[in-house]
Design a protein with these regions (language model features):
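Rossmann-like dinucleotide/phosphate-binding beta-alpha-beta segment
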Residues: 136-196
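An N-terminal-biased, well-structured beta-alpha scaffold segment characteristic
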Residues: 1-93
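Residue-level detector of anion-binding/catalytic polar loops
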Residues: 23, 91, 113, 170, ...
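Phosphate-binding beta-alpha-beta segment of Rossmann-like dinucleotide-binding domains, i.e.
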Residues: 96-147, 162, 173-176
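Short gly/ser/thr-rich secondary-structure transition/capping motifs
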Residues: 28-32, 51-52, 127-136, 184-190
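Short low-complexity, flexible loop/linker segments enriched in glycine and/or proline
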Residues: 40-42, 108-111, 186-189
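Short beta-strand elements at the ligand-binding edges of bilobed clamshell
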Residues: 91-97, 191-193
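Structured loop/turn residues at beta-strand edges in well-structured enzyme cores
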Residues: 43, 62-65, 116, 141, ...
Length: 196
């Protein structure tokens, strides 16, 4: 069985596939694969491991004569024409919860970087302009007792709110539907999009 991987991913994937005697090939250029290169590599693949940057439209799918599965190395799969893949008998999978914590961590890291003027501090040090501590130097803003707004109360929004709550923030959120888990864990209040 031939497996094509559209970009280098953690080596364990190739190792496990090769241990099962799959013929694995990996696109190894350090840039997203072009449509032409994708067409050339998927035409005889039985399976493809794709990235969110790889567009699988009807043109690409029509060239996948042997393919039975596209395993999308991403949370979503809006880069793949799912309905057309189904018509072609190609199963599409994804990794729906793999980045929830990483994304929530990054959202909090960026919030802290803004609130505490982290980039300004780094620039000051890099430019060798830091001359020692001063009471108002890069003071920034405390998160405690601030209102923290969440747009979208799915897995990532909920995980971000839980982290933000640990800084003593008041959580408000907008979502199409009420999220009782979010509300119970953080005391969050659902508001309108306009209010948020």
């Amino acid at each position: 069985m031939k497996v094509f991987i559209t970009q280098e991913i953690p080596e364990i994937a190739s190792t496990l596939l090769k241990a099962k005697n799959f013929d694995v090939s990996v696109y190894s250029k350090n840039k997203p694969i072009s449509k032409k290169e994708l067409l050339n590599n998927v035409k005889d693949a039985d399976a493809v491991i794709s990235l969110l940057t790889d567009k699988f439209d009807s043109d690409i799918l029509d060239h996948m004569l042997n393919c039975k599965v596209i395993a999308n190395y991403a949370v979503g799969f809006n880069n793949i024409d799912i309905n057309y893949a189904r018509q072609k008998g190609i199963t599409v999978t994804n990794t729906p919860d793999v980045l929830t914590d990483a994304t929530a961590d990054l959202a909090i890291a960026l919030t802290l970087a803004c609130a505490r003027r982290l980039v300004d501090g780094i620039d000051l040090v890099r430019q060798k302009k830091f001359n020692g501590w001063l009471p108002k130097l890069l003071l920034g803003v405390e998160l405690k007792d601030k209102v923290f707004g969440i747009l979208g109360a799915g897995r990532i929004g909920t995980a971000t709110a839980i982290r933000a709550k640990s800084f003593g923030t008041k959580i408000i959120y907008y979502s199409n539907s009420k999220n009782e888990i979010l509300e119970n864990k953080t005391g969050a209040k659902k508001v309108t999009l306009e209010y948020l």
